[in-house]
Amino acid sequence: MLYIQLETREMLMSKIFKLYQIVIDKQLSDLINTEGWDCHIDALSYRNASEGDPTFGIINDCYTHVADLVCDDLDHCFEVGNGYGSADRFVKKTGVNRTSVSVGDLIEDEDGLLHLVDSIGFRNVTHLKTTPHM
């Protein structure tokens, strides 16, 4: 269990948030560079999410659970996810390279509410949640 790894009382009182991202690997990156952003469903979803609309990515199951963040709130998730504070609060999933929290990413709280990292702040997009694993 994740709590066993945590040592301070403050961290034990924090919540666990799930970070979801649309992963662009080298192969997809090469394809995007050759054919443009409309070349693949993940690329199009990534572009749309970066512009504030995660609908296509959520509906088409393009998001991957890349990390758990042990934080107090969404703002704290943004800080921890971008390298500020204790590295123990950022628990990446196996096989995932170090990542940062960016516009277009999704953060799910312990209540199951889904939040889009927007250009300024966060937006609740729980109503778009349709995939069983999210």
Predicted regions and their residues:
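A short beta-strand micro-motif
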Residues: 5, 15-24
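Conserved ATP-binding/catalytic motifs of P-loop helicase motor domains
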Residues: 134
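Short, compact, well-ordered microdomains
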Residues: 96-131
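Short, conserved turn/kink motifs that form compact alpha/beta structural patches or helix kinks used as
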Residues: 47-106, 110
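Catalytic phosphate/metal-binding cores of nucleic-acid and nucleotide-processing enzymes, i.e., regions
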Residues: 12, 23-29, 36-58, 113-116, ...
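Short, Lys/Arg-enriched N-terminal segments with co-localized hydrophobic residues
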Residues: 1-12
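Short conserved micro-motifs at the rims of enzyme active sites and ligand-binding pockets
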Residues: 29-31, 128-129
